[in-house]
């Protein structure tokens, strides 16, 4: 799109050129592979000198629209959709780190990411150094000559902590390494990390982007601004790829996502299906509308809980007594999302009783659904962490995580009220 359209227009139109059939909706190209008009074109496709379809593991016209749309919504130069958020996170690390390298990460991460960093990546020879994200000096101190990336979440899961993204980006860039930000809990409608120094953004598109709890997907978006070749830190971008006639990824306009596609997606195959891409696109078209209502409902629920006599604490960065209030004001003028945590007086047992007493809320391991959701993180999403690791991640035994949906707000609050009465 030649004109610089606004967010609400981009979420409906970005990335799509009407195909020869004239279909207004994005078509589902349900095919595994694509016909070459001749041998020369086939050779060019495989050499990456002729853009176009080869095999849907590497790309598909339906997915191409999703790639471009999310990239534009994030203000990025390029994007690539994959099979899940976990795949997006994994690829973002493996794209820059090899055996003997390390990354520096905030300790307050989603349990699945924490497990990836502590259980799986070490098998590849990649170490993770966890730091307290409230102390910027720890990021600086943890970086060494083998550090390839700093990794944070724009809104921590499940503690809903905020980080000074620009300050962390400045630290990373001082050492000529990239900052990767998981922006799942914010969505590009509430926050765009690339505008505050991040180099790569990852999403579990299953959450707000898709929005309806139907489809697994992940997306990686790059700024296109980081000089991988000139940084001296990334030989995979500065040295030629012998499998593609010496192609140097660092010479490309969007090196990060091209390298994922040409190497990691080619070899490990965590590809998104055309149908899944189409389903996520349906959610993206209403992203701003849904997130506005999510935030509106969440604020009212937070107000209700903070005044309830059975509630011990509420963690939501917009609250005046939150230590993240200043960061919420700085980075999240439209709101800090609709996922937050709280504790019930009576501790873990009372909290679990509340979870079991809710009727509208579904007890399940997802967030950012149109429907309201609840979970007890210590016994589920972060159960594989020991007590010390849970504490470092901001998970307490009494913590309950809510994801506020789009139901009538009175029904949501009444459901919480009756469950609190039973807790």
Model region roles, listed by residue range:
Residues 51, 77, 216, 276, ...:
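Short amphipathic alpha-helical segments
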